[in-house]
Amino acid sequence: MNSTQMMQWGGMPCVRLNAGGYTALIAPDLGSNVIRLRDEERGVEFFRFKNSNTYEELIQSAEVWGLPTLYLPNRFADGILKTSDAVYHLPVNEKAPYNNHIHGFLHKRPHTVVE
């Protein structure tokens, strides 16, 4: 049965999703980090998960626990992103001497859940 539930986990508000035999636990206050993704039928955890984790542990080691949204921040030299079929010119938001376009901040921003 599919379901959505607002709950507290590790001292923070979370959204628990159940669908198709899978459970996901998402922390909106941590940039919608998918803290847990589990195949309930097989008992398989897709990400490292510890039920006793705290909010502080998750913030200090976001790269270890779960799957942060649009993780990792990075930079493009001179604001230029080249792909196989195009060249994109992004605004330079890290000025001289570096002249980069820096991206990746959503994983550090709280998100709002709307029903």
Where on the chain are the PLM-derived regions?
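Surface-exposed acidic/polar loop and edge beta-strand patches at domain peripheries
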Residues: 1-115
